[in-house]
């Protein structure tokens, strides 16, 4: 059983690696065990972590945002028993390779490009030049010893992206602007990563959106 509500990909890898070691030890009669850091160590770090830097960051990012970025202005979708419709688009090998090369040339990654592309989509369907949406973070990058911990660390936090300097495609400056926007998005994500353990409720309180 694997689900992000109880674990993440790295946890699954640690478990499978441990199983492989156990099987190997039975064959070779050796002890290759690796010490695992208790998950409670992460909980203690999270509880004792000062939040003033997180609060200052999210206030600077979100205090002027007073309306959620709701696609087509739809804020609440009724929950029904029907299976939601899904649309999938597979990026084939050649295009995937081109995307990796293009983003690497700008010192970024395809993940940064997809964040920027989604921001552009939201901006168009919401009629806004600044959007905010959730970005899923691993939660392990700023946690000492996390590479040896089993458990869930994933956190989803709001990312703000400005589209004011992003001209329409086909214009003479579009290419340069995409590169500039990609770099700006990379910087935004890098800053957000340094606050990846901040509670989502704290980020919400720092925005100008009224509580429901």
Task: Describe the function of each predicted region.
Residues 1-38, 123, 134:
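Active-site-proximal acidic secondary-structure segment that organizes catalysis
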Residues 11-17, 110-118:
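Short amphipathic alpha-helical segments
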Residues 30-34, 68-73, 132-135, 200-203:
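Short, hydrophobic secondary-structure boundary micro-motifs
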Residues 62-68, 91, 102-104, 137-138:
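Soluble acyl-CoA-dependent acyltransferase catalytic core bearing the H(X)4D motif
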